[in-house]
């Protein structure tokens, strides 16, 4: 089994075990190991695989799934300019604190700045607009990588051979676990007047519908919401 196959399988298996169900894939050449791993996982009914050819649209599609589910949604692309198409969705995920996981395939580090076909400097490409940025050619512990919120970038270096014939059943014995839930900071609000209104912005700031309704009822205030509760 090649190092690229090992890296792809470890990454996808860990994400499945962390309870991630939806994956958005834009197929390409360098991310072929990830594509094969995802198709195999989908064939076993372990994930929901959404294929979108356009990377910009794929990233916003993943953003929408994350907003609906509250879970991290990986969006996967090949190397080169494909990665740059994620930036608009990354900005929105950053400012809205949406859990978007960017899995970008890359060539090995030794080919950077050499004039080799298609490499660009993908590591750190999203700057301060991601809450974590990782550049690796070997498997890493994703439970710590995703112990946060908002967009996270993992740049995966895949070397040749990208595809090998291997019939190993690498998806047996899946042990599901959950990502740790973030604790919200609580505060006490005492209205100074009886004429109050509760305005709920986009994404509810992470609060559950029941929490919002309970708070509004406790102060006798009407609710004005941007989205349906």
What is the predicted function of each stretch?
Residues 2-229:
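N-terminal alpha/beta PP-like core and its mobile active-site loop of ThDP/TPP-dependent enzymes
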């Amino acid at each position: 089994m090649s190092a690229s196959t090992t890296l792809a399988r470890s990454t996808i298996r860990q994400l499945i075990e962390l309870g991630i169900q939806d994956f958005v894939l834009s197929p390409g050449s360098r991310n072929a190991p990830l594509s094969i791993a995802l198709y195999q996982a989908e064939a076993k009914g372990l994930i929901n695989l959404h294929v979108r050819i356009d990377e910009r649209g794929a990233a916003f599609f993943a953003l929408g799934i994350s907003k609906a589910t509250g879970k991290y949604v990986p969006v996967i692309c090949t190397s080169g300019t494909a990665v740059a198409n994620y930036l608009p969705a990354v900005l929105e995920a950053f400012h809205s604190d949406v859990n978007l996981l960017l899995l970008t395939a890359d060539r090995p580090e030794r080919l950077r700045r050499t004039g080799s076909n298609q490499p660009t400097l993908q590591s750190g490409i999203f700057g301060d607009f991601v809450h974590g940025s990782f550049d690796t050619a070997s498997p890493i512990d994703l439970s710590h990588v995703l112990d946060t919120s908002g967009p996270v970038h993992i740049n995966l270096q895949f070397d040749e051979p990208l595809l090998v014939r291997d019939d190993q059943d690498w998806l047996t014995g899946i042990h599901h676990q959950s990502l740790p839930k973030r604790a919200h900071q609580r505060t006490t609000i005492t209205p100074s007047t009886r004429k109050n209104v509760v305005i709920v912005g986009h994404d509810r700031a992470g609060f559950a519908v029941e929490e919002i309704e309970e708070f509004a009822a406790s102060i006798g205030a009407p609710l004005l919401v941007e989205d349906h509760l």
